[in-house]
Each structure stands twice: as C-alpha cells, then as structure tokens.
Amino acid sequence: MLFNVGYSETVKLFDWDCLVFHDVDLLPEDDRNLYTCPDQPRHMSVAVDKFNYQLPYKGLFGGVSAISVQHFTLVNGFSNQYWGWGGEDDDMAKRLGSQKLNITRQCGPLSLVEVHRGLALIG
C-alpha cells in the first residue's frame, strides 16, 4: 500500500514519467546501474547475493523495479490487499501480464545487488 501512497505523493511534485520502486535494504554493486524506464517494465535486482546471484523464480518483480507512470496507471498500481512484507510484487507481475506487458530484466554486472544486512528488516 505504501508504494501507491509514494506514487500519489510523487506525481504531485512533478510530471514524472518513470517510477523506480526500491527496497531500502538492497544496494547495487555497480554504480553504473541506470535508474531509467525502458519501453516495458524492468526488474532491476535480478542477481541478489542472498540468492547466490540467481533469479529465484521467473515471475519475480520485487526488490528493485522500474515502471513507467503510464504502465503503473494502466494496471491500477499495486494491490492494497497486502499488508506487511511480501506478495505485492508477485501480484504486480500478474497485473502487468494481464495487460500484455512483458517484464524485462537487466543482466550482467549491472544487475548485481547485495542485501545490506544492517538494513534488512526481515529475512
């Protein structure tokens, strides 16, 4: 639900065209990682150290994700049915798929992410 609140407040400040949803405990290992929105939604935290730099499952869209305001609006944002940790990102992946949007994935060194243990609240 806080992702939707963040969106609502952010679009009041400026006419943004790109949104990046970023878990606070994930830190990119390469500072050349560009926080931009391509033509399709992009999952940016593909290779997380916690998962041995492997994508845990195909439908993952959590951690760090970039999506255009147009696509976010098209899928009506994140579901407000989830409280606490987990589930909202998988639901978003399904929402994107239902609108025939394809999740793209950043690959190579730019996709490497480390979980900052001092910031992790769960897991």
Where are these regions (language model features)?
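Short coil/turn segments at secondary-structure boundaries
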Residues: 1-3, 32-35, 56-58, 77, ...
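Conserved donor-nucleotide/metal-binding helix-loop-beta segment in metal-dependent transferases, i.e.
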Residues: 28-53
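Active-site-proximal specificity loops/subdomain of glycosyltransferases
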Residues: 1-16, 51
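Short beta-strand-to-loop acidic/aromatic patch adjacent to the donor-nucleotide binding site
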Residues: 13-29
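A recurrent flexible, glycine/aromatic-enriched loop bordering the glycosyltransferase active site
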Residues: 49-67, 74
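Amphipathic alpha-helical interaction motifs in eukaryotic regulatory proteins
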Residues: 4-11, 45, 73-79, 93-98
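C-terminal catalytic/acceptor-binding lobe
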Residues: 81-84, 90-123
